[in-house]
Regions:
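A short, N-terminal amphipathic alpha-helix
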Residues: 32-49
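N-terminal nucleotide-binding beta1-loop-alpha1 segment
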Residues: 1-21
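Conserved donor-nucleotide/metal-binding helix-loop-beta segment in metal-dependent transferases, i.e.
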Residues: 105-132
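Conserved alpha/beta core of the MobA/IspD/sugar-nucleotide pyrophosphorylase nucleotidyltransferase superfamily
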Residues: 153-377
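Active-site acidic Asp-centered loop
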Residues: 100-102
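Short beta-strand/loop segment that forms part of the nucleotide-sugar
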Residues: 48-58
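Short phosphate-binding loop-to-helix
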Residues: 60-97, 106, 331
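Short, glycine-/small-residue-rich phosphate/pyrophosphate-handling segment
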Residues: 125, 140-165
Length: 377
């Protein structure tokens, strides 16, 4: 058995329903798996982490077999996360744990890995967001079995759960592209591809996937112009927006609302909802075209307010503006309007208006994360 002496990364990649072959959901699943391996390898090579324990299905196991920096645990059909975590801790005698989501941590640097390692060893628990976290580091010896057993099944809630149930000293990860950038949508992959020149396993995958057809150039051109103005809408962290704004010449007009939507599950109130009700959609889209030269929208709020029941595949198709294949009537209508817009508009979720915009602003500033840079991270 592996002797765990450092920080042990753990990830659960749990797809309860296998995506339909050829779907956007399938492409996202496969791309996230490549990201897991790239990120796990970089953590292991940094010298601050042990092998990553990956908990997943048989398909992921086949990909992981030949890798010396991962240990694979086959997932159970119905998983209770807390029960499974305690089982893994006891099986491998783990103490210092770094749990990360598949789409996170890709741009964390070696210095940031060092920061996580040193402060976790000091007894602090760390995450990139106290409310909805993408990664979290803690010592299992500081927790009772009862606390571990009752971990929420949704990993974004881990940080807020520990803050509410324990007296552990919390340390928020400093804001950077590495701590903010997370991949949940097709446009996140397109942005990753753009700023890395398709480095690593994930870059190779994207360059041969449906994501390679996503055009970001028109929007990047708008970001690069002093005379341009963009509209950013969604669950925007003001600090992330400030850091992006420092890098880009264009002006930013933004509306930030509904942060915490994922935890609540439904949009509660919305200024945009008021605008949509007071103006018809045609007038509102014309307004966007008149007041700005480009946009980047977190559509999950809009769909929560107006779309009713919908499949995740419809959301991904909307992100890629493939409105013809969308089943939900509202999402189809909305996406068609965006696709026909005279200005370039990027669609996505929380990640695209935070880490995505920050990454594009770095690109405009001239900072590329090519293979030579990635090798130093």
């Amino acid at each position: 058995m592996t002797n765990f002496k450092k920080i042990t990364p753990i990830i659960i990649e749990n797809w309860n329903v296998q995506p339909q072959k050829g779907s956007v959901s399938e492409a996202i699943k496969e791309a996230r798996e490549e990201m897991i391996f790239d990120t796990s390898h970089r953590m292991f090579e940094s010298g601050y982490f042990d092998s990553t324990i990956i908990i997943g299905n048989e398909n992921l196991l086949q990909k992981a077999k030949k890798l010396n920096f991962v240990i694979f645990e086959k997932i159970e059909k119905k998983i209770n996360f807390g029960k499974y975590l305690l089982k893994i801790i006891n099986k491998y005698l783990l103490d210092k744990i770094f749990y990360f989501g598949a789409g996170s941590c890709y741009f964390l640097t070696k210095d940031e890995f060092k920061f996580i390692s040193e402060n976790t060893i000091k007894g602090q628990f760390i995450s990139n967001n106290p409310v909805s976290s993408d990664f979290i580091s803690f010592s299992s010896s500081d927790l009772t079995n009862e606390i571990i057993l009752n971990f929420p099944n949704i990993d974004n809630y881990f940080s807020s759960y520990l803050m509410s149930k324990t007296f552990l000293k919390y340390l928020k990860m400093p804001v950077s592209l590495g701590s903010v950038f997370d991949i949940d949508t097709p446009n996140d992959f397109a942005i990753l591809s753009k700023i890395t020149n398709n480095s690593g396993n994930i870059g190779n995958y994207i360059s041969n996937s449906i994501f390679k057809n996503i055009d970001l150039d028109k929007f990047i051109k708008v970001l690069s112009s002093k005379s341009s103005e963009i509209f950013v809408y969604g669950r925007i962290n003001p600090l992330n927006l400030y850091m992006a704004e420092k890098n880009i010449p264009c002006k930013i007009r933004f509306l930030s609302e509904e942060r915490g939507l994922k935890i609540r599950g439904k949009a509660s109130s919305s200024l945009l909802k008021y605008f949509f009700k007071s103006e018809n959609f045609d007038n509102l889209f014309k307004l966007f075209e008149n007041i700005c030269d480009g946009g980047i929208f977190d559509t999950r709020i809009i769909f929560s307010l107006f779309a009713g029941e919908y499949e995740q595949e419809d959301v991904y198709l909307s992100d890629m503006k493939i409105w013809q294949k969308i089943k939900n009537p509202f999402i189809k209508f909305f996406t068609k309007k965006i696709a026909e817009s005279k200005i370039p508009i990027i669609l996505g979720g929380h990640s695209v208006v935070n880490g995505g915009l920050m990454a594009l602003s770095n690109l405009v500033r001239g900072k590329k994360y090519d293979s030579s840079y990635m090798s130093q991270m």
